[in-house]
Amino acid sequence: MNTPIADFVRRYAASDAVRFHMPGHKGRPFLGCEPWDITEIAGADALYEAEGIIAESEKNAGALFGSRRTCYATEGASQCIRAMLYLAVTAGKSRTVVAARNIHRAFISAAALLDLEVVWLWPEESRSLCGCPISEKNLEQTLSALPEPPAAVYLTSPDYLGGMA
């Protein structure tokens, strides 16, 4: 499988082109990775309007993952969590999301920004501040107590300690 982004960046770094673009270090080594640190320059594609090497790389990743489509994102999990919640609540009529207590902090800000009603799943037992073991029974009881199905159920699994929901 070809690696369009890595190949482009390697070629660009090796070209010793004068950089009149961001980032400000201009590719001069300080930590060692600067020659490969670029922005949306000609040929590098644009993440949110991918048509070139990023689109090709996403297509390759999708084939590797066996998914219909793969989209790269910035900001780690936070942006993806916000997008997921937005899509979940705009796809249906419910603004309720059921969530375990060990959620990512981006969930809290997304829930506030989207004005969601969060129904918390309480673990049957808690062995730590980070763990939140949720059983199938616990989830079924919570869902059956709701007047209507939620827009989504948000579980972190495996959790930060390796526990599975």
Regions found by a protein language model. Give the residues of each.
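N-terminal "arm"/small-domain region of PLP-dependent enzymes with the aminotransferase-like
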Residues: 1-52
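Conserved N-terminal alpha-helix of the aminotransferase class I/II PLP-enzyme fold
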Residues: 34-79
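Conserved beta-loop-alpha segment that forms the PLP phosphate-binding cup at the N-terminus of a helix
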Residues: 69-94, 105-110
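Gly/Ser/Thr-rich loops at beta-strand to alpha-helix junctions
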Residues: 54, 75-80, 103-105, 158-162
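Short, acidic/turn-prone active-site loops that include or flank metal/cofactor-
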Residues: 102-105, 122-128
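Active-site phosphate-binding strand-loop segment of PLP-dependent enzymes
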Residues: 128-165
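Substrate-binding/gating loop at the entrance of the active-site cleft, primarily
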Residues: 99-117
